[in-house]
Amino acid sequence: MSLSINAVARTQEGKGASRRLRNEGLVPAVIYGGETAPVSISFKDNELLKAVGTPGFLTGLVEVTVEGKTEQVLVKALQRHPSTGAVMHMDLQRAQADKAITTRVPLSFINAAQSEGVSKQGGRLTVESKLAEVRCLPANLPEVLTVDVIKGQLDQIFHLSDVILPEGVELVSLLKGEDHDQPIARIGKSKR
Protein backbone atom coordinates (compact mmCIF):
# COMPACT_ATOMS: atom_id res chain seq x y z
CA MET A 1 0.00 0.00 0.00
CA SER A 2 1.44 3.36 -0.91
CA LEU A 3 0.30 6.69 0.45
CA SER A 4 -0.74 9.63 -1.74
CA ILE A 5 -0.31 13.37 -1.36
CA ASN A 6 -0.84 16.33 -3.68
CA ALA A 7 1.77 18.99 -4.38
CA VAL A 8 2.12 22.15 -6.44
CA ALA A 9 5.08 22.96 -8.70
CA ARG A 10 6.99 26.07 -7.70
CA THR A 11 9.23 28.33 -9.74
CA GLN A 12 10.91 30.42 -7.05
CA GLU A 13 13.79 28.84 -5.18
CA GLY A 14 16.16 29.88 -2.43
CA LYS A 15 15.99 30.84 1.22
CA GLY A 16 13.74 33.88 0.77
CA ALA A 17 11.26 32.04 -1.46
CA SER A 18 11.14 29.11 0.97
CA ARG A 19 10.48 31.48 3.88
CA ARG A 20 7.61 33.12 1.95
CA LEU A 21 6.13 29.68 1.20
CA ARG A 22 6.24 28.70 4.88
CA ASN A 23 4.53 31.98 5.83
CA GLU A 24 1.74 31.05 3.38
CA GLY A 25 1.27 27.62 5.00
CA LEU A 26 3.28 25.69 2.43
CA VAL A 27 6.31 23.41 2.81
CA PRO A 28 9.00 23.46 0.09
CA ALA A 29 10.30 20.16 -1.27
CA VAL A 30 12.35 18.78 -4.16
CA ILE A 31 11.86 15.58 -6.19
CA TYR A 32 15.13 14.34 -7.68
CA GLY A 33 16.69 11.23 -9.19
CA GLY A 34 16.05 9.05 -12.19
CA GLU A 35 16.36 10.30 -15.74
CA THR A 36 14.33 13.46 -15.11
CA ALA A 37 15.52 16.86 -13.90
CA PRO A 38 14.80 17.79 -10.27
CA VAL A 39 11.40 19.37 -9.66
CA SER A 40 10.79 22.01 -6.99
CA ILE A 41 7.39 21.57 -5.36
CA SER A 42 5.46 22.60 -2.26
CA PHE A 43 2.92 20.86 -0.02
CA LYS A 44 0.16 22.33 2.13
CA ASP A 45 1.60 22.09 5.63
CA ASN A 46 -1.58 20.64 7.19
CA GLU A 47 -1.80 17.88 4.55
CA LEU A 48 1.89 17.11 4.92
CA LEU A 49 1.65 17.00 8.72
CA LYS A 50 -1.18 14.48 8.45
CA ALA A 51 0.78 12.38 5.92
CA VAL A 52 4.01 12.43 7.97
CA GLY A 53 2.07 11.03 10.93
CA THR A 54 0.82 8.09 8.85
CA PRO A 55 2.74 4.84 9.44
CA GLY A 56 4.97 4.03 6.48
CA PHE A 57 5.16 7.57 5.08
CA LEU A 58 8.81 8.07 6.00
CA THR A 59 9.90 4.50 5.16
CA GLY A 60 7.71 3.42 2.24
CA LEU A 61 6.72 4.49 -1.23
CA VAL A 62 4.67 7.67 -1.52
CA GLU A 63 2.67 8.75 -4.56
CA VAL A 64 3.08 12.48 -5.15
CA THR A 65 0.76 14.14 -7.67
CA VAL A 66 2.06 17.39 -9.15
CA GLU A 67 -0.29 19.13 -11.59
CA GLY A 68 -1.94 15.88 -12.67
CA LYS A 69 1.27 13.84 -12.98
CA THR A 70 1.83 11.13 -10.35
CA GLU A 71 5.28 9.86 -9.36
CA GLN A 72 6.35 7.24 -6.83
CA VAL A 73 8.98 8.60 -4.45
CA LEU A 74 10.83 7.82 -1.24
CA VAL A 75 11.34 10.38 1.50
CA LYS A 76 15.13 10.81 1.66
CA ALA A 77 15.40 13.79 4.01
CA LEU A 78 13.00 15.66 6.24
CA GLN A 79 14.03 18.89 7.96
CA ARG A 80 12.09 19.99 11.03
CA HIS A 81 12.03 23.22 12.99
CA PRO A 82 14.17 22.69 16.12
CA SER A 83 11.61 23.92 18.64
CA THR A 84 8.19 23.44 17.02
CA GLY A 85 8.88 20.22 15.13
CA ALA A 86 7.14 21.62 12.04
CA VAL A 87 8.36 20.24 8.70
CA MET A 88 10.57 22.88 7.06
CA HIS A 89 11.72 21.08 3.89
CA MET A 90 11.65 17.64 2.32
CA ASP A 91 13.82 15.83 -0.22
CA LEU A 92 12.12 13.10 -2.24
CA GLN A 93 13.81 10.54 -4.50
CA ARG A 94 12.05 9.08 -7.55
CA ALA A 95 11.54 5.33 -7.48
CA GLN A 96 11.87 3.71 -10.90
CA ALA A 97 10.07 0.37 -11.28
CA ASP A 98 13.05 -1.37 -12.90
CA LYS A 99 15.81 -0.07 -10.58
CA ALA A 100 16.57 -1.31 -7.08
CA ILE A 101 16.15 1.17 -4.25
CA THR A 102 17.88 1.29 -0.88
CA THR A 103 15.85 2.45 2.09
CA ARG A 104 15.19 1.71 5.76
CA VAL A 105 12.22 -0.44 6.79
CA PRO A 106 10.79 -0.86 10.33
CA LEU A 107 11.41 -4.12 12.20
CA SER A 108 8.56 -5.86 14.02
CA PHE A 109 9.36 -8.38 16.76
CA ILE A 110 6.58 -10.95 17.21
CA ASN A 111 5.83 -13.65 19.81
CA ALA A 112 8.12 -12.19 22.50
CA ALA A 113 5.62 -12.83 25.31
CA GLN A 114 5.29 -16.49 24.27
CA SER A 115 9.04 -17.13 24.04
CA GLU A 116 10.58 -19.34 26.70
CA GLY A 117 13.11 -16.66 27.61
CA VAL A 118 10.33 -14.22 28.53
CA SER A 119 7.43 -16.40 29.69
CA LYS A 120 9.34 -19.06 31.68
CA GLN A 121 12.80 -17.66 32.39
CA GLY A 122 11.73 -14.15 33.45
CA GLY A 123 13.56 -12.28 30.71
CA ARG A 124 12.62 -9.19 28.75
CA LEU A 125 13.03 -8.41 25.05
CA THR A 126 15.19 -5.34 24.46
CA VAL A 127 15.12 -3.96 20.92
CA GLU A 128 18.43 -2.46 19.81
CA SER A 129 17.48 -1.56 16.25
CA LYS A 130 14.03 -0.49 15.04
CA LEU A 131 14.98 -0.14 11.36
CA ALA A 132 16.91 -2.22 8.83
CA GLU A 133 18.34 -1.00 5.54
CA VAL A 134 17.07 -3.02 2.58
CA ARG A 135 17.64 -3.13 -1.17
CA CYS A 136 14.87 -4.19 -3.55
CA LEU A 137 12.72 -3.17 -6.48
CA PRO A 138 10.00 -0.66 -5.54
CA ALA A 139 7.27 -3.28 -6.13
CA ASN A 140 8.89 -5.58 -3.54
CA LEU A 141 9.36 -2.96 -0.81
CA PRO A 142 7.82 -4.33 2.41
CA GLU A 143 6.00 -2.08 4.88
CA VAL A 144 7.64 -3.93 7.77
CA LEU A 145 10.14 -6.75 8.31
CA THR A 146 9.27 -9.44 10.84
CA VAL A 147 11.51 -11.11 13.41
CA ASP A 148 9.90 -14.10 15.15
CA VAL A 149 11.42 -14.45 18.63
CA ILE A 150 9.22 -17.38 19.77
CA LYS A 151 12.27 -19.64 20.21
CA GLY A 152 14.15 -17.03 22.21
CA GLN A 153 15.95 -18.10 25.37
CA LEU A 154 17.32 -15.99 28.20
CA ASP A 155 20.55 -14.18 27.15
CA GLN A 156 19.88 -14.88 23.46
CA ILE A 157 20.84 -12.24 20.90
CA PHE A 158 18.92 -11.82 17.65
CA HIS A 159 20.81 -10.65 14.56
CA LEU A 160 19.88 -9.27 11.14
CA SER A 161 20.13 -12.81 9.79
CA ASP A 162 17.06 -13.67 11.92
CA VAL A 163 14.87 -11.24 9.95
CA ILE A 164 12.23 -12.95 7.78
CA LEU A 165 12.81 -11.51 4.30
CA PRO A 166 10.16 -11.42 1.57
CA GLU A 167 11.20 -12.58 -1.89
CA GLY A 168 13.30 -10.04 -3.77
CA VAL A 169 14.41 -8.14 -0.65
CA GLU A 170 18.03 -8.07 0.59
CA LEU A 171 19.51 -6.64 3.77
CA VAL A 172 22.27 -4.20 2.82
CA SER A 173 24.46 -5.06 5.83
CA LEU A 174 24.40 -8.78 5.03
CA LEU A 175 25.49 -8.08 1.44
CA LYS A 176 28.78 -6.84 2.95
CA GLY A 177 29.51 -10.20 4.57
CA GLU A 178 28.76 -12.28 7.67
CA ASP A 179 30.81 -10.00 9.93
CA HIS A 180 28.16 -7.29 9.32
CA ASP A 181 25.38 -9.41 10.87
CA GLN A 182 24.70 -6.90 13.64
CA PRO A 183 22.55 -7.54 16.73
CA ILE A 184 19.03 -6.11 16.59
CA ALA A 185 17.48 -7.40 19.84
CA ARG A 186 18.19 -9.55 22.89
CA ILE A 187 16.35 -11.33 25.66
CA GLY A 188 17.98 -10.31 28.91
CA LYS A 189 17.24 -10.56 32.58
CA SER A 190 14.40 -8.35 33.71
CA LYS A 191 15.41 -5.61 36.17
CA ARG A 192 12.42 -6.10 38.45
From Swiss-Prot:
Pfam families: Ribosomal_L25p, Ribosomal_TL5_C. GO terms for cellular component: cytosolic large ribosomal subunit. The keyword Ubl conjugation does not apply. One of its GO terms (molecular function) is 5S rRNA binding. The keyword Magnesium does not apply. Coiled coil: none annotated. One of its GO terms (biological process) is translation. SUPFAM superfamilies: Ribosomal protein L25-like. Keywords: Ribonucleoprotein, Ribosomal protein, RNA-binding, rRNA-binding. This is one of the proteins that binds to the 5S RNA in the ribosome where it forms part of the central protuberance. Part of the 50S ribosomal subunit; part of the 5S rRNA/L5/L18/L25 subcomplex. Contacts the 5S rRNA. Binds to the 5S rRNA independently of L5 and L18. NCBIfam families: bL25_bact_ctc, PRK05618.1-5, PRK05943.1. Belongs to the bacterial ribosomal protein bL25 family. CTC subfamily. This is Large ribosomal subunit protein bL25. It comes from Marinomonas sp. (strain MWYL1).
